[in-house]
Amino acid sequence: MQLNSNGWHVDDHIVVAVSTGIDSMCLLYQLLNDYKDSYRKLTCLHVNHGVRSASIEEARFLEAYCERHHIDLHIKKLDLSHSLNRNNSIQNEARIKRYEWFDEMMNVLEADVLLTAHHLDDQLETIMYRIFNGKSTRNKLGFDELSKRNGYQIYRPLLAVSKKEIKQFQERYHIPYFEDESNKDNKYVRNDIRNRIIPAIDENNQLKVSHLLKLKQWHDEQYDILQYSAKQFIQEFVKFDEQSKYLEVSRQAFNNLPNSLKMVVLDCLLSKYYELFNISAKTYEEWFKQFSSKKAQFSINLTDKWIIQIAYGKLIIMAKNNGDTYFRVQTIEKPGNYIFNKYRLEIHSNLPKCLFPLTVRTRQSGDTFKLNGRDGYKKVNRLFIDCKVQQWVRDQMPIVLDKQQRIIAVGDLYQQQTIKQWIIISKNGDE
């Protein structure tokens, strides 16, 4: 049984994830024998999921095996009681916790490469699983031989080796291992694919499961192209303000993308800049219909912390302002520099004293101001519409009133002509 050893070098510290199953024990055996000169140091990691009674026996066996072969071994016992008590599927949670521990240990050990015993049959099973559960469009179809994770590399040296070859190798060298009885239970989807569906396909002489590997190659090439296109789009069209937790993209440019690329763009933005959202394709498609509608302004709640705001020609992803405190009313008795919400107000000393005290507040229904250079008044709300001001900006913008409660300034959009040079309003942080 030949390993693909291109994923590590002779001066590397390699770490092997060993479950005591036939695959990982055969991998470990090869590393201790035919490939013993291919690395500098070898360490084993074992996870006791604490679900099966045989787990304790497996851990003891591996301790004795590693001691006999002078291998450093680290064991982690997971607590999955929360999922068991709630009747949740433990497979996904176990995988997440397992790799969190791998992350921790690879850092502690200062190791270079983590080896796993995924083989060819695992690859075919994973491809089929992702196709039929609808997760093929936004992920690679199966495993990569080499992948990067949190400062280290994961390598799968058995990915071209079939389960049949592994079994023949085990029988030839009498390699000890444990059989996980739960692998025979077809109530688990992956087991059903492995034990029932794939063998049924292989029985048909006109069908070959191995053709899935060609599909994976083609699919993954298209996936990489989409990822590249998404990064190019983000670089060209997305403006990101990390301090304000705010990003902005042209609504038209986004709407012009094909739906497949829209999904990848949003996946990149939501996972890279914020929390790891898990948005379904169906939800995305509903959003895309709203984005392309003629409605000028609306919002979509992502979570209790994040929101998508559509404002005229802009698509904005931002943190909700629920936790922030904003001024609603402020009184100014004398000239000076003041902050109102996210605006800076400079009140000059030349402003006539008869206008004081000034009232600074946010908008109210029915607000109007006198037009400059002609008769008549205009509604503040109409000014906002004409200037395409987003709803959340309208809610914070300062409106300045004189002593007689006449509006003399509306943010950075309007100042009464007679006092324009004496009241300067700008967004806080603008030069």
Curated annotation (Swiss-Prot):
The main location is: cytoplasm
One GO BP annotation of this record: tRNA modification
The reaction(s) annotated as catalysed by this protein in its Swiss-Prot or TrEMBL entry are: cytidine(34) in tRNA(Ile2) + L-lysine + ATP = lysidine(34) in tRNA(Ile2) + AMP + diphosphate + H(+)
Which ranges of the sequence are coiled-coil? none
Q: Name one GO molecular function term.
A: tRNA(Ile)-lysidine synthase activity
Q: What is its EC number?
A: 6.3.4.19
Annotated binding of ATP, by residue:
19-24
Domain of life, per the record?
Bacteria
Q: Where in the cell is it found?
A: Cytoplasm
InterPro entries on file: Lysidine-tRNA-synth_C, Rossmann-like_a/b/a_fold, TilS/TtcA_N, tRNA_Ile_lys_synt, tRNA_Ile_lys_synt_N
The record lists the membrane-crossing segments as: none
Stored CDD domains: TilS_N
Q: Which Gene3D superfamilies match?
A: HUPs
Any single Gene Ontology cellular-component annotation: cytoplasm
Its biological function? Ligates lysine onto the cytidine present at position 34 of the AUA codon-specific tRNA(Ile) that contains the anticodon CAU, in an ATP-dependent manner. Cytidine is converted to lysidine, thus changing the amino acid specificity of the tRNA from methionine to isoleucine.
Q: Which HAMAP family match?
A: tRNA_Ile_lys_synt (MF_01161)
Q: What is said about the domains? A: The N-terminal region contains the highly conserved SGGXDS motif, predicted to be a P-loop motif involved in ATP binding.
The record's annotation in PANTHER family points to: TRNA(ILE)-LYSIDINE SYNTHASE-RELATED
**Sequence similarity:** Belongs to the tRNA(Ile)-lysidine synthase family.
Protein name, as recorded: tRNA(Ile)-lysidine synthase
Organism lineage reads as: Bacteria, Bacillati, Bacillota, Bacilli, Bacillales
